[in-house]
Amino acid sequence: MSFKDLRSFIEHLESNGELKRISHPVDPHLEMTEIADRVLRSKGPALLFENPVGNDMPVLANLFGTPKRVAMALGKEDPLALRDVGELLAFLKEPEPPRGFKDAISKIPMFKQALNMPPKTVRNPPCQEVVKTAEEVDLTKLPIQHCWPGDVAPLVTWGLTITKGPRQKRQNLGIYRQQLLGKDKLIMRWLDHRGGALDFKDFKEKHPGDRYPVVVALGSDPVTILGAVTPVPDSMSEYAFAGLLRGERTEVCKAISCDLEVPATSEIILEGYIDPEEMAEEGPYGDHTGYYNETDSFPVFTVTHITHRKDAIYHSTYTGRPPDEPAMLGVALNEVFVPILRKQYPEIIDFYLPPEGCSYRMAVISIRKQYPGHAKRVMMGAWSFLRQFMYTKFIVVVDEDVNCRDWNDVIWAITTRMDPKRDTVMIENTPIDYLDFASPVAGLGSKMGMDATNKWEGETDREWGTPIVMDEAVKQKVDEIWSDLGIDDAPTL
């Protein structure tokens, strides 16, 4: 099943018991966060607050609060099925030469499908049913969530920021938080390495002093939203990838104030510009680390136009100590990463980003070890292969007999197969999440790799221990007589 807009996905979730309408008045100032946090931690449904205090625009929260709903957004029922998406991405990133004529013929449909998914431009789009300009523009009339007591101001969280640089043929879609600064101003918090910031940098170099056009889409269809957080190949637009997943082209329309193309079925569109000379202090805000972050200076986004659908829905979230919605999104997208990594490193058995590690700060990788030093090669490869892992501080590599998603197994491997000096890799002065205040310098810190694999000749001079395993015949016999022993139900092994 595919969804052309957010509303059809909401209907699908509600019909499947995955969305709850809240008619009781709830304040976007702190109350929504507390309710959404409790529901997410109990693995509850998406929430549609129909009567936000001080506003008549409904607020959608906790949309991707479980891996299952992330899968449902992509037309899947099981998060493990997201590996199909990873297989597709792996193919698009590095298609293998055909092994023969029949293989070449079999791959034609996939290439054809990928090439035939440019966005479809539509007229009279739903996102422009209502148009506000000049004095009508007032961001304070949106039910923007104020998430935590120490937050400096309300925060736009789920906006798809649409930019285009002079060096790129395609647009970039990115999700960057935006602090409410005034009726027509937001602070655009994008880090230097992110696509929007790079586009802006290139624009300033080519057009010094000029205003930079920017558009933010709120409440887009779920596939386009997820396309913006998926490792799409640089040569492919997020719109084309979303169309590929959906099975039909993404509908877009031209923005009113500039040439940028926006998702036509979005609930709300903010159009405007960034003046390269206008900066403002952003923060502090509670973030996915579970702490309030430091303040810093970022560009100001001036909104000149607000367009929206009739009876628009405001899509929002919060970030905090895991589990939060980004962490659950990370758990689901973990399955997308596995095939991509395996394509480059076939020896990888499994890959896990534990949500407790703030989605990406720690990774555990199980491998089919083939030679001394193999674990260290995999560490280096994971850090450098995808930009999503640039900020991963800790990588633990284990053997294929260890379940990398089970901390009992992982801790056992670390404590029995590692020597701290020999098996720990430390790398200094590497890119680190700017929000990681544990690093000695903002944006620059160290990484640690832990080789928790069995050691081969050349890695140790000692005889390596053999794991204790019970005889299978004995286990089978005990299974057969268990009910006669008068012991409670057999434990699950």
From Swiss-Prot:
Keywords carried by this UniProt record: Cell membrane, Decarboxylase, Flavoprotein, FMN, Lyase, Manganese, Membrane, Metal-binding, Ubiquinone biosynthesis
Location relative to the cell: Cell membrane
- Cofactor: bound how, per the entry note? Binds 1 prenylated FMN per subunit.
- GO terms for molecular function, please? 3-octaprenyl-4-hydroxybenzoate carboxy-lyase activity; metal ion binding
Query: What is the membrane topology here?
Result: Peripheral membrane protein
Q: Name one GO biological process term.
A: ubiquinone biosynthetic process
Q: Where does prenylated FMN bind?
A: 175-177, 189-191, 194-195
Which sites bind Mn(2+)?
172, 238
| Active-site residues from the entry | 287
What EC number(s) does this enzyme carry? 4.1.1.98
Q: Does the keyword Lipoprotein apply?
A: no
Which cofactor is recorded for it? prenylated FMN; Mn(2+)
Per UniProt, the enzyme's principal EC class comes to lyase
Q: Which SUPFAM superfamilies match?
A: FMN-binding split barrel (SSF50475), UbiD C-terminal domain-like (SSF143968)
Its GO CC terms are: cytosol; plasma membrane
Indicate the principal place this protein occupies in or around the cell: membrane
- Swiss-Prot/TrEMBL catalytic activity: a 4-hydroxy-3-(all-trans-polyprenyl)benzoate + H(+) = a 2-(all-trans-polyprenyl)phenol + CO2
Pathway(s) per entry: Cofactor biosynthesis; ubiquinone biosynthesis
Q: Which Gene3D superfamilies match?
A: Single helix bin, UbiD C-terminal domain-like
Q: Do the record's keywords include Isomerase?
A: no
Look up the coiled coil feature and give its residue ranges: none
Q: Which family does it belong to?
A: Belongs to the UbiD family.
- Subunit composition and interactions: Homohexamer.
Q: What does the protein in this record do?
A: Catalyzes the decarboxylation of 3-octaprenyl-4-hydroxy benzoate to 2-octaprenylphenol, an intermediate step in ubiquinone biosynthesis.
What protein name does the entry list? 3-octaprenyl-4-hydroxybenzoate carboxy-lyase
Which species does the entry assign this protein to? Shewanella piezotolerans (strain WP3 / JCM 13877)
Source gene? ubiD
